[in-house]
C-alpha cells in the first residue's frame, strides 16, 4: 500500500469542481472504493482494533529510509535474498539514496511476503517490521474524516457513519504516540510495544489530522525550532540528531508534499503565522532549486 491520501484528495477535487452534479455518479463510485480501502487498513493492519494501523514495509509509508525505521529494521535479515541490480542509483547520486544494506532488507521483506502468497491475513503478524507511523495514521484519519463529510453530502449515510467512527477512534488513539520529552508524536514499534526515539517529520505530519489545538501549537513550535537550523522548512529529520543526513533522501532533505500537508493542517488549526513561513520557504526553495 501507500499513504491513504485518496479520501482527502477526492473531497478537495470535488470542492473545486465547476459542475458537481455532472460528476456525482463517478464520485459516488470513488467514495465506495475508498471506503473499501479504509476498511482494508483497519481489517488487516490493526489487529488489536485500537484504531492505529501499522506499516509492514518502509516503502508503504513513502518515507523509505527514514531514521524512524532503523530500530525495527535491525530485526529484518539480509541473508538469502535473490541477486538484484539497483536502477535508482543509475539516475541519482548513490549518496542521496538508501544504502545497500537497507535495500537488502527491503527486498527480504518483499520476498518474505511473496512466500506467503501475499495473504493479508498473514502478512502483518509474519512481518518482523511492524511500525505505527503517526504521519501515516494522520493521513488515514484525515482521509476518513474527509470521506465521511463527502459521503454525508452525497447522502451515503452508511459510508459516512463508518468513516466518522474510524476517524474518531483513531484520533483518540493517536495520543498514545505523543511524547512530552520530544514534544512531538513518535512512531511505535508494535513488536516491542515501545515508542521509537526518532524526531522525524512523520511525527510533525500528525497535524494533518484534526488533533487538539494545544498539540497543533506544540508541533508548530517544534517545526519552528528544527527549521531554524536549516535554510528551508521543514527538514525531514531533526538536524540536532546525529543521524541527520542533509543529502540522503528522508533523513534530512525537505519534501514539498510534506510541507503541503503540514501547512494544510496548520491552516486548519488557525496557526497562520507558522503556515505562512512554510509556504514562503517552499516557494523560495523552488525558486532557487527548481521544481
Language-model regions, residue ranges each:
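Extended, well-ordered alpha-helical scaffold segments
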Residues: 21-41, 143, 147, 154-174, ...
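Short amphipathic alpha-helical segments
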Residues: 257-261, 273-281, 290
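Short, flexible helix-adjacent loops and helix caps
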Residues: 15-19, 46, 152-156, 179, ...
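Extended glycan-interaction surfaces of carbohydrate-active proteins
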Residues: 1, 50-132, 169-254, 287-291
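Internal, well-ordered domain-core segments that constitute the primary functional module
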Residues: 2-75
Amino acid at each position: 500500500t501507500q499513504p491513504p491520501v485518496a479520501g482527502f484528495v477526492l473531497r478537495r477535487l470535488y470542492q473545486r469542481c465547476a459542475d458537481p452534479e455532472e460528476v456525482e455518479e463517478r464520485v459516488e463510485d470513488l467514495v465506495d472504493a475508498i471506503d473499501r480501502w479504509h476498511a482494508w487498513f483497519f481489517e488487516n493492519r490493526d489487529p488489536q482494533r485500537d484504531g492505529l494501523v501499522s506499516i509492514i514495509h518502509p516503502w508503504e509509508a513513502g518515507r523509505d529510509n527514514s531514521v524512524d525505521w532503523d530500530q525495527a529494521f535491525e530485526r529484518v535479515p539480509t541473508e538469502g535474498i535473490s541477486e538484484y541490480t539497483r536502477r535508482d542509483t543509475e539516475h541519482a547520486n548513490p549518496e542521496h539514496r538508501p544504502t545497500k544494506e537497507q535495500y537488502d532488507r527491503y527486498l527480504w521483506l518483499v520476498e518474505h511476503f511473496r512466500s506467503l502468497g501475499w495473504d493479508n491475513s498473514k502478512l502483518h503478524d509474519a512481518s518482523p517490521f511492524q511500525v505505527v507511523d503517526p504521519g501515516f495514521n494522520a493521513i488515514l484519519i484525515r482521509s476518513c474524516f474527509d470521506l465521511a463529510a463527502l459521503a454525508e453530502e452525497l447522502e451515503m449515510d452508511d459510508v459516512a457513519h463508518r468513516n466518522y467512527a474510524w476517524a474518531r477512534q483513531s484520533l483518540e488513539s493517536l495520543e498514545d504516540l505523543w511524547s512530552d520529552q520530544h514534544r512531538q508524536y513518535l512512531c511505535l514499534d508494535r513488536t516491542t510495544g515501545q515508542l521509537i526515539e526518532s524526531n522525524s517529520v512523520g511525527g510533525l505530519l500528525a497535524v494533518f489530522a484534526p488533533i487538539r489545538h494545544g498539540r497543533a501549537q506544540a508541533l508548530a513550535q517544534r517545526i519552528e525550532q528544527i527549521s531554524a537550523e536549516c535554510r528551508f522548512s521543514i527538514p525531514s529529520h531533526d538536524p540536532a540528531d546525529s543521524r541527520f543526513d542533509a543529502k540522503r533522501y528522508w533523513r534530512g532533505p525537505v519534501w514539498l508534499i510534506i510541507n503541503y500537508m503540514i501547512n494544510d493542517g496548520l491552516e486548519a488549526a488557525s496557526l497562520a503565522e507558522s503556515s505562512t513561513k512554510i509556504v514562503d520557504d517552499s516557494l523560495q526553495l523552488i525558486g532557487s532549486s527548481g521544481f
